Structures are given as structure tokens and as C-alpha cells.
Regions:
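Electropositive phosphate-/nucleotide-binding environments in soluble metabolic enzymes
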Residues: 2, 34, 38, 143-146
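N-terminal capping segment at the start of a domain
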Residues: 2-30, 130-131
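Alpha-helical scaffold segments in soluble metabolic enzymes
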Residues: 7-10, 39, 148-151, 155
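Flexible, glycine/charged-enriched surface loops at secondary-structure junctions
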Residues: 20, 51-53, 161-166
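A non-catalytic alpha/beta surface segment that caps or lines the substrate-entry region
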Residues: 22-72, 76-78, 82
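Beta-rich nucleic-acid/ligand-interaction surfaces
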Residues: 60-63, 166-172
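Active-site metal-coordination/substrate-binding segment of hydrolases
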Residues: 72-162, 171
Length: 172
């Protein structure tokens, strides 16, 4: 089972930048988005999800974790794989373990995340933070969602003692 942080880093390094000039004309707006969906297809099959399908007409991947108990509702989880129309080549995430509450330099870009400007950073003292190096976007919107969903489904498949109804997922 791949660790959450490693999976997240692997996902955000994938360039799935949107192309605003193709919005509403081509779905998905870039070929790299479909490539990422195809990689997710393989990963979901390997993890053990069922009914894994990609609809190439609308660029949606769907899959199922079967129920392991009766009388539980079907629950769906949805996330998108495209990222903002901003530099997404050579993404270099930075991992800041045990955040100390101070400024966070974003690589050598000259950009800094400061608790003076972002006071909510103080809520994360002692935690691990993952940021961009300042030269690209990180792509956490919404590869964090994709990572959370895939990791949760893998956990439930590997821990059948946790009872649940049918779980459906969709990525697009």
C-alpha cells in the first residue's frame, strides 16, 4: 500500500493543466488529463475496485467498491483531475515536516508564505505541509481530492472488517 504523501506527490507531478481556450469545445481540454485518467484506471484496477470504466466522450472515470454489508446506502465521491491554467511543467513539490510556525520559502523563487499574511498557517504548527517551489502551481485543487478518495477506497478494500454500502467514485 503506497503512503498517502507519496501518492499525493506522484499525482501533483502530473501536468493536467486546463486549456481555457478549449473550454466547452474539447473534453478534456488537454490530452494530459486523459493520460492521468488512464493511469488512475490502471491504479484502481490494481487496488481492486470493480466496474472501472473511462467514458472517453466526457472524460469521466468511474469505479465501484462493492458493499460488504446489507442495508447501507450507496455513497459517491467525486473529484476533478484538471488544474488551473497556470504553469504546470516540472512541478517540484516541497515537503515541510514539523512546520515551526515561521515563514516558508517557496524554493528559490523569492516567494514566501508568511503567517503575517496567512495567519491560518499557525494552525498547522507541528504538521507536515506540502507546497510548490514557487515556479509552478502545486495542483492540490483537486489532486488532493483524488488522492484522498483513492487512498480511502484502498484502505476500505484492505480492511473488510469496516462495513460499508456500495461506494461509487468518479473522476473527470
Amino acid at each position: 500500500m503506497e503512503g498517502f504523501v507519496n501518492r499525493f506527490i506522484r499525482y501533483v507531478k502530473k501536468n493536467t493543466r486546463s486549456d481555457a481556450s478549449k473550454a466547452g469545445v474539447v473534453i478534456p481540454s488537454t490530452a494530459s488529463q486523459m493520460e492521468f485518467l488512464e493511469e488512475l484506471y490502471k491504479e484502481l484496477k490494481e487496488i481492486g475496485l470493480e466496474d472501472v470504466k473511462i467514458n472517453k466522450n466526457n472524460a469521466f472515470l468511474t469505479a465501484t467498491v462493492p458493499a460488504n454489508t446489507d442495508n447501507a446506502p450507496v455513497i459517491g465521491f467525486i473529484s476533478h483531475v484538471d488544474t488551473a491554467d497556470f504553469n504546470a511543467e516540472n512541478i517540484s513539490p516541497q515537503i515541510h515536516e514539523n512546520y515551526d510556525g515561521g515563514d516558508i520559502a517557496l524554493g528559490n523563487s523569492g516567494f514566501v508564505l508568511s503567517p503575517k499574511e496567512f495567519p491560518n498557517l499557525k494552525n498547522y504548527i507541528g504538521q507536515t505541509l506540502i507546497t510548490t517551489d514557487g515556479t509552478t502551481l502545486l495542483g492540490a485543487d483537486d489532486k488532493a481530492g483524488v488522492c484522498e478518495i483513492v487512498s480511502a477506497m484502498e484502505y476500505l478494500i484492505n480492511n473488510p472488517q469496516i462495513k460499508h454500502g456500495k461506494l461509487r467514485i468518479a473522476f473527470g
